[in-house]
Amino acid sequence: MMTVLKPGVTDYATPNDTDIVVTRVLKAPRALVFDAWTSPKHLPNWMTGPDGWTMPVCEVDLKPGGAWRYVWRKDDGAEMSMSGFFREVSPPDRVVSTESWGPEWPETLNTVVFTESAGYTTATLTMHFASKETRDAALKTGMKEGMDMGFARLDTLLAAA
């Protein structure tokens, strides 16, 4: 049975042993969602995870082969970072990139596809992990909760645009 998604609700699926598929319907045109998802002007305003975190470093060279890097800082001074390279950039339809949380985590391949219908954009992010163990470990990090908080901020950002 197919799940009907509503704006403001994020769906998380594990269709196989190595993938997580995250789907979110956003009330905004695709070009605007693509820009918010890829621009260092907008990313620090919504992709911050749980309350108390900021993104003081957001570097994006949005082209095939270009690098990206995010650094988050918690209000107590703790930091975490993630980086990768863009493999494919097709505005406003699709972005494929690698993701690394450091040497202790195997690289992930992320593909996000943006589709628009009747003024709403569906963002479908497929995260491909090296193994079931790595995928399951990612799910146990609080990833869903952090992403849900970020997506709520993205909804607010898009509504104000």
What are these regions (language model features)?
Residues 30-31, 62-63, 87-93, 113-122:
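A short, structured loop/turn motif at beta-sheet edges
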Residues 96-145:
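Beta-strand/loop substructures that line and gate deep hydrophobic ligand-binding cavities in soluble
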Residues 1-6, 130-161:
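A conserved amphipathic terminal alpha-helix motif
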Residues 24, 57-60, 82-88, 99, ...:
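Hydrophobic/aromatic beta-strand elements that line small-molecule binding cavities or substrate pockets
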Residues 21-22, 41-79:
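Short beta-edge strand/loop motif at the mouth of beta-sheet-based domains
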Residues 17-23, 55, 67, 81, ...:
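Intrinsic-disorder/low-complexity, polar/charged segments enriched in Ser/Thr/Lys/Arg/Asp/Glu/Gln
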Residues 33, 43, 68-70, 86, ...:
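Hydrophobic pocket/interface hotspot
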Residues 1-52:
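Hydrophobic ligand-binding cavity/cleft-lining segments
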